[in-house]
Every structure is written in C-alpha cells, then in structure tokens.
C-alpha cells in the first residue's frame, strides 16, 4: 500500500473516527497505524485522554524505531478507549470508533481504531496493546486477525501502561502471515512468519473443559460448527474464573497506582467511564493483589500441564458479536474469554470466521515462547476457514 493512497482512503472514511492524530511521514514501506499509547516521533501520545500534555514526542518508542529500520511508515495514531480502560473504543474526547462491518456497532477495544484501520483497508497492518484482550476483542468484532504474542516479547518502553505485569504489544492485520510479520518486526525476531501450514489432521487441538458457555446465537452457531469440524475434545483445565480474576486483580491494582495522582489532582480531565472504572479499581484489596502475584506461576504450570500433548487450545474470542453503539453495553461477554491468557502470558491469535452477518473471532492459544509454532497452526486454520468450511 502507498502512503498517499492510505491517506486518501482515510479522508474518505473520516466518519469512522479511526485516528486521533496523523503523521506527515512519506516513504515506500509498509503503512502501519499505531495505537495512541505508543510514542511516535513528531506526534503527541494522548492515551485517548485529555490528562496528558499534547506535545509532539521527540523520540520514537524502541519498537517504532525498530520498524523504521525495516522501512515501515507510520500513518497516524489510532483512537481507543480512554487509557485502554474499556472494550468498546467509545471515546468521550475523540469520538466513537465505528465498526466498518456495521456503522451502528462498536469496533471493540481498547485497540478499536487499530482494528478498524485494518478492516477499512487504511493500512497494511496496525499496532495494538493487549492487557485483558484489547487486541483480540476488536479483531474479533471487526473481522480481522489479532496476534497477542507471549508476554514480554516486545519492548514496552515508550508505551503508556495500563498494567506493567500484563501489558503486551501486538499486531492486527488482514491475514495471519502479515500479523506474524508485524510482531516479528517489532520484536526483532527472524523466522517467525510461517512458510507453510501443517496438515490439519496432524494438529492436536482441544478446548478447555467447562469454559465455553453462554454464547449468543451467532457466536454459538459458529462455535458449534468449528468444534464439530475439528472434533475438539474437552480437556481438564484450570477454571476460567480463577485465571480471569488473577488478571483483573493485577490490572486493577497496578492501574489504580499509576493513576492515583491524576485522579486526586485533576479528576475532571477523565471521562465518566474511565473515572468510575479507576475509582472502582481502588477497591481491590492488597491481599488480592498479593494472591494474584503469588498464584500466577502455579496457574501457568497447571495450564502447561493441561496442554501437555496438545498443540493449541481453541475458545471463542468473545461470547457475543459487536453490540450496538446506542444503548447499554455489557462488556462481560466481550472480555470473558480473553483475560485468562493475559494472566498466563501465552501467545494467542484471534482468527476471523466469515458468517452471513457480523464477524466472529476464534482464539487459538499456544504455549509460552512458541509463537512461531502457533503462527503455523493459525495459518492452517486460516486456510481452512477462509475457504468457507467453517462458515455459518
């Protein structure tokens, strides 16, 4: 994609509210959209908020500097949930990011602008961050690929935090190879992009026992087709609620600590949702935070043991399709299946499934540090599903 063509398309789709700021960069390289938590030289970093000064950054975050070394061109900074505190990208300061699949519905969050940029064809790929599902949720709702690599794969220096124990930089793209290449470029890894896919029959895939319940009609129908097609066995697995609680307790305590001074000095600069969310996070007891820290390694070990003999586990990315912008939005079905894998730190792809209606995403979850192997598995599933065999 040429940067001039990308800018022209962006101008045509201004009503989607995808970007907060644009760059004036030129060049022949891959066009990349960057979530506005990440420092890009010459642009401010807002975190989707009005708390911070809007002064242009003098330096790139290291991951952006690495991308420039590969010839990438940054088109702009994408809209998001304020301070990444949400799963809708309905931003009170910079506008609601609209889902390119249906303009009356949310794009998901918190990396909604990054997902919408890919879905709308404005960039070659985009960068998001994922602390409790913020790459995978909008990827699923917008019908694109989202890749959250193993925790700490990509340097988060120059990335504003939500939770230092959980924050993970990831990629969004229209296909597995591009999403994998994006993460590999940011991480300075070689050999990650799969040259070929393994035979589907050679893969050992499963679903965590007792996890997948309460799906809406569209997601439920797609999941039944996928589980039947792949003949997924249910395997014993640590409880979803226990893993998700560990993630939420870490996130809440660390976010509350980071925002404590601003909440005290300038609460009026926060939107109502972010302010209420942060104030609620102060309710996490110190004992719960200590338990979440202490329990993380044992639960990681339990998950690794449960996956022994399997290449990956699959679960829906969200329990529901993209909600309507108007009306009350229940975030629980959007975050139900994602937070667990931030707590464990495992690599995860969200792969889109074509339906006759709104997009649906399926998570493909691998082992810690085996991101390249997971990319090959995701490619195999993408090739099957893009051929229509998993359509509902």
What is each model feature region?
Residues 103-115, 129, 133-134, 138-139:
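Gly/Ser-rich catalytic serine loop of serine hydrolases
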Residues 31-33, 75, 204-208:
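Short, well-ordered beta-strand segments
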Residues 1-26, 185-335, 343, 383-392:
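Amidase signature
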């Amino acid at each position: 994609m040429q940067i001039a063509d990308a800018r022209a398309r962006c101008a045509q789709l201004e009503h989607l509210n995808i970007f907060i700021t644009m760059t004036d960069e030129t060049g022949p390289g891959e066009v990349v959209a960057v979530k506005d938590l990440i420092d890009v030289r010459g642009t401010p970093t807002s975190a989707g908020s009005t708390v911070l000064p809007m002064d242009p950054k003098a330096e790139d975050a290291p991951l952006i500097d690495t991308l420039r070394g590969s010839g990438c061109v940054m088109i702009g900074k994408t809209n998001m949930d304020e301070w990444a505190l949400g799963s809708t990208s309905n931003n009170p300061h910079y506008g609601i990011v609209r889902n390119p699949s249906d303009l009356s519905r949310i794009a998901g969050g918190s990396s909604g602008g990054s997902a919408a940029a890919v879905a709308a064809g404005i960039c070659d790929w985009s960068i998001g961050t994922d602390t409790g599902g913020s790459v995978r949720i909008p990827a699923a709702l917008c019908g694109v690929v989202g890749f959250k690599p193993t925790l700490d794969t990509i340097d988060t220096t120059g990335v504003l935090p939500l939770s230092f124990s959980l924050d993970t930089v990831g990629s969004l793209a229209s296909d597995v190879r591009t999403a994998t290449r994006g993460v590999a470029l940011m991480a300075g890894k070689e050999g990650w992009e799969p040259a070929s896919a393994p035979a589907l029959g050679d893969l050992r895939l499963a679903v965590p026992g007792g996890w997948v319940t309460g799906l809406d009609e569209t997601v439920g129908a797609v999941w039944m087709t996928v589980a039947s097609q792949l003949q997924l066995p249910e395997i014993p697995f640590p409880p979803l609620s226990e893993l998700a609680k560990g993630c939420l307790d870490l996130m809440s305590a660390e976010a509350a600590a980071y925002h404590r001074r601003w909440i005290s000095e300038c609460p009026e600069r926060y939107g109502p949702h972010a302010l209420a969310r942060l104030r609620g996070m102060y309710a996490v007891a110190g004992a719960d935070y200590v338990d979440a820290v202490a329990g993380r390694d044992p639960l990681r070990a339990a998950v690794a043991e449960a996956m022994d003999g399997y290449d990956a586990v699959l679960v829906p990315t969200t329990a529901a399709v993209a909600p309507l912008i108007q009306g009350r939005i229940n975030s629980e079905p959007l975050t139900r299946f994602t937070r667990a894998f931030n707590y464990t730190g495992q690599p995860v792809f969200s792969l889109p499934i074509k339906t006759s209606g709104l997009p649906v995403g399926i998570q493909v979850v691998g082992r810690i540090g085996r991101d390249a192997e997971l990319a090959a598995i995701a490619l195999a599933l993408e090739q099957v599903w893009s051929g229509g065999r998993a359509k509902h």
